[in-house]
A protein has these predicted regions:
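N-terminal Rossmann-like NAD(P)+-binding domain of SDR-like oxidoreductases, especially those catalyzing
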Residues: 1-156
């Protein structure tokens, strides 16, 4: 007997796919939603991923959300655009607007979603080392524990 149906957005990603494995192992039905877009993906689902429902779709698309949320009790929202540059608009649209659309649909359509789990972005680790023509080598710090404790996840 299933413990319930879980939708994992970003389900083809590293964290999403491994979350699916664990949820399947512990008795949940799993539905994955992913756009399988490069450069993160090759356009195919991971071959090692266990058998579960897979949906090609985009969290920026209302119809994809509606289709993916049908019959779902739990959402693990991991879908994210990972590169801030060179396309900040796409980064914002996927990461912020896509998440807002999830909550908008749950409320507006009175969906029976019992719990939503949202993960932070990789920004909590800092931007990594890079070379800037003006400033030379730059290696920004990670996020200070004090900021993280206050829920201030993103850089200022």
């Amino acid at each position: 007997m299933s413990k319930g149906r879980v939708l994992i957005t970003g389900g083809a990603g590293f964290i999403g796919a491994h979350t699916a494995v664990e949820l399947l192992r512990t008795g949940y039905d799993v539905r994955l939603l992913d756009n399988l877009m490069p450069p993160i993906h090759t356009g195919e689902w991971p071959r090692w991923l266990p058998d579960c429902e897979r949906m090609l779709g985009d969290v920026r698309n209302r119809e994809d959300w509606q289709r993916a949320l049908r019959g779902v009790e739990y959402v693990v929202h991991l879908a994210a655009h990972q590169d801030l540059l060179p396309n900040f608009a796409q980064f914002f649209h996927v990461n912020s607007v896509g998440t807002a659309l999830l909550y908008e649909l749950i409320v507006a359509e009175k969906l029976p979603v019992r719990k939503v789990v949202v993960a932070s972005s990789q920004f909590v680790y800092g931007e990594g080392r890079y070379r800037c023509a003006k400033d030379g080598e730059v290696f920004p710090d990670g996020r200070a524990p004090e900021r993280l404790a206050k829920g201030l996840w993103e850089p200022v």
